[in-house]
């Protein structure tokens, strides 16, 4: 039975990550679960940087850029021993399942945890839109539209040719 979940963002940040954190947290609380936010992704997991997340913590984050949990890349996480340490710490925190939001490297990390028997679910979040199994990743559409809007503003400013 799942009573407590962890949520982390890893790799490069992408628009929509805060909305995903908010959605995961609110849904979990609605279902009676406790949520632990892991700061700075897998790097923070290894250095034991966590904080409980409640409704108030995620209430006003939906329109902020980046990720409230911050993010980092963690080359150390490619090692099996490091992955085992991460699972041990998750169990020490009494986290029953982990939600990972990020790109391809984040997904590989989540897959490694899953192979070690730790329940993990992923939300693809990358501006690159280069993930198999999904047509659009979290952050891609916003990024494309922001670039398009910026280009149009520049063209308007200089006078369209």
Regions found by a protein language model. Name each.
Residues 11-15, 101-108:
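Gly/Ser/Thr-rich loops at beta-strand to alpha-helix junctions
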Residues 36-39, 114-137, 141-144, 148:
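Short, acidic/small-residue loops that bind anionic groups at enzyme active sites
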Residues 45-100, 105, 137-152:
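Glycine-rich oxoanion-binding loops at beta->alpha junctions
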Residues 161:
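Conserved small/polar residues in nucleotide/adenosyl-binding loops
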Residues 1-46:
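N-terminal phosphate-binding or glycine-rich loops at protein starts, especially the Walker A/P-loop
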Residues 8-9, 38-39, 70, 100-102, ...:
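Short beta-strand segments
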Residues 19-24, 105-118:
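Short Gly/Thr/Asp-enriched flexible loops that form oxyanion-binding sites at enzyme active sites
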């Amino acid at each position: 039975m799942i009573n407590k979940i962890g949520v982390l963002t890893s790799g490069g940040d992408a628009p929509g990550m805060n909305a995903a954190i908010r959605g995961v947290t609110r849904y979990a609380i609605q279902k009676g679960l406790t949520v632990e936010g892991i700061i700075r992704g897998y790097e923070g997991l290894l250095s034991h940087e966590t904080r409980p997340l409640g409704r108030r913590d995620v209430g006003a984050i939906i329109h902020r850029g980046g990720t409230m949990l911050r993010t980092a890349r963690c080359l150390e996480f490619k090692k099996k021993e490091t992955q085992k340490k991460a699972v041990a710490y998750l169990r020490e925190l009494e986290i029953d399942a982990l939600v990972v939001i990020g790109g391809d490297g984040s997904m590989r990390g989540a897959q490694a945890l899953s192979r070690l028997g730790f329940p993990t679910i992923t939300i693809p979040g990358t501006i690159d839109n280069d993930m198999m199994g999904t047509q659009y990743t979290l952050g891609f559409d916003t990024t494309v539209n922001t670039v398009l809007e910026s280009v149009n503003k520049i063209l308007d400013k200089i006078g369209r040719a």
